[in-house]
């Protein structure tokens, strides 16, 4: 059975908290940026385990900050759906500045 986001967050916290109970959001963000940099530079960018490193840190950050990930993603998707989008030169999508941008509640 697939785990919910909250279940994954709890599993990650149960693993990492005993290893680093004093971790702080700033340190987690720094490590997240490091992992993203490695993913970009790596020939393993399509490796699910490398992507998982990034997701584990992002979910741990959300836990540290008290973010309800499911609620935040749904709210952000609603904002993104209301925006106009264009393809950037690197192939990624970017929203067009000034397009509909309601704020997060």
UniProtKB/Swiss-Prot annotation:
- Which top-level enzyme class is recorded in the Swiss-Prot or TrEMBL entry? hydrolase
Question: Which catalytic reaction applies to this protein?
Answer: dGTP + H2O = dGMP + diphosphate + H(+); dATP + H2O = dAMP + diphosphate + H(+)
Gene3D superfamilies for the chain: MazG-like
Q: Which GO terms describe its molecular function?
A: hydrolase activity; metal ion binding; nucleotide binding
Task: Indicate the transmembrane segments per the record.
Answer: none
The source's superkingdom equals: Viruses
User: Per the record's keyword annotation, is Nucleotide-binding included, yes or no?
Assistant: yes
Q: Which Pfam families match?
A: dATP-dGTP_PPHyd
Q: According to its UniProt record, which cofactors does this protein need?
A: Co(2+)
Query: What keywords does the record list, in alphabetical order?
Result: Cobalt, Hydrolase, Metal-binding, Nucleotide-binding
UniProt pathway: Purine metabolism
Q: What is its EC number?
A: 3.6.1.9
Give the family, as the similarity comment puts it: Belongs to the Caudovirales dATP/dGTP diphosphohydrolase family.
**Protein role:** Catalyzes the hydrolysis of dGTP into dGMP, which is needed among other for the first step of biosynthesis of dZTP (2-amino-2'-deoxyadenosine-5'-triphosphate).
Protein name, entry field: dATP/dGTP diphosphohydrolase
């Amino acid at each position: 059975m697939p785990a919910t986001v909250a279940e994954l967050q709890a599993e990650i916290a149960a693993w990492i908290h005993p290893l680093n109970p004093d971790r702080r959001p700033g340190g987690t963000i720094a490590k997240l940026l490091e992992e993203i940099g490695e993913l970009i530079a790596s020939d393993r960018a399509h490796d699910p385990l490398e992507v998982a490193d990034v997701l584990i840190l992002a979910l741990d950050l959300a836990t540290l900050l008290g973010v309800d990930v499911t609620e935040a993603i749904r709210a952000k998707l609603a904002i993104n759906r209301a925006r106009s989008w264009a393809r950037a030169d690197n192939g990624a999508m970017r929203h067009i500045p000034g397009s509909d941008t309601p704020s997060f509640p």
